[in-house]
Amino acid sequence: MSSSEEVSWISWFCGLRGNEFFCEVDEDYINDKFNLTGLNEQVPHYRQALDMILDLEPDDDLDDNPNQSDLVEQASEILYGLIHARYILTNRGIGQMLEKFQAGDFGHCPRVYCECQPMLPLGLSDVPGEAMVKLYCPRCMDVYTPKSSRHHHTDGAYFGTGFPHMVFMVHPEYRPKRPASQFVPRLYGFKIHPLAYQIQQQAAANFKAPLRSLSYNNGKR
């Protein structure tokens, strides 16, 4: 960066509206080529994108070609997301995400009996472009769509399918107990038997069958 007052690309990206789920990946992690194995085959303009993430001087061609610059910017976001998915499986990355988890930065479970349990981001696919990020509740162990629409366009592959499970494998002390209570449907104060709905549906089906037959016979007269 040309000025000491300017923030790094990583800080800028993580500070964007809608990117609140991301943590700042350590530059030392990115500079270790081993951690980036295979990403050059997944991301177009890989070299230029990596330079942008690390705040290295861009090629002169980018300054002369605005369209190319936009493509590299898009590639940088994809590359950072894929690096992020790997980084948050490391001890340092897990530590950063746990801080956000404890602060409730990822939101809280909407299920009443989970009692506002903080959630963790989860991808339903590790392939970019297949599914947007979801939120995993470790108490009811179910998955939810983020409450805010600004997170509905964040790719789930940037967090990965195994992140929450890795967190609780490494730090089992953060895993909450399963909820002791479960909602029980009642009518006039009495519990509704699980088979009640099935019996009602069957009764309704049996009631409609004679009516259809009667209507058919009336139509032939």
Swiss-Prot record:
Record PROSITE patterns: CK2_BETA
Chain segments annotated as transmembrane: none
Modifications after synthesis and translation: Phosphorylated by alpha subunit.
Keywords associated with the record: Phosphoprotein, Wnt signaling pathway
A GO-annotated cellular component: protein kinase CK2 complex
Highest taxon of the lineage: Eukaryota
Record's keyword annotation contains Phosphoprotein: yes
Gene3D superfamilies reported in the protein's UniProt record: 2.20.25.20, protein kinase ck2 holoenzyme, chain C, domain 1
Any Pfam family hit: CK_II_beta
GO biological process, one term: Wnt signaling pathway
GO MF, one example: protein kinase regulator activity
Subunit structure: Tetramer of two alpha and two beta subunits.
General function of this protein: Participates in Wnt signaling. Plays a complex role in regulating the basal catalytic activity of the alpha subunit.
Family the UniProt entry places it in: Belongs to the casein kinase 2 subunit beta family.
Protein name: Casein kinase II subunit beta
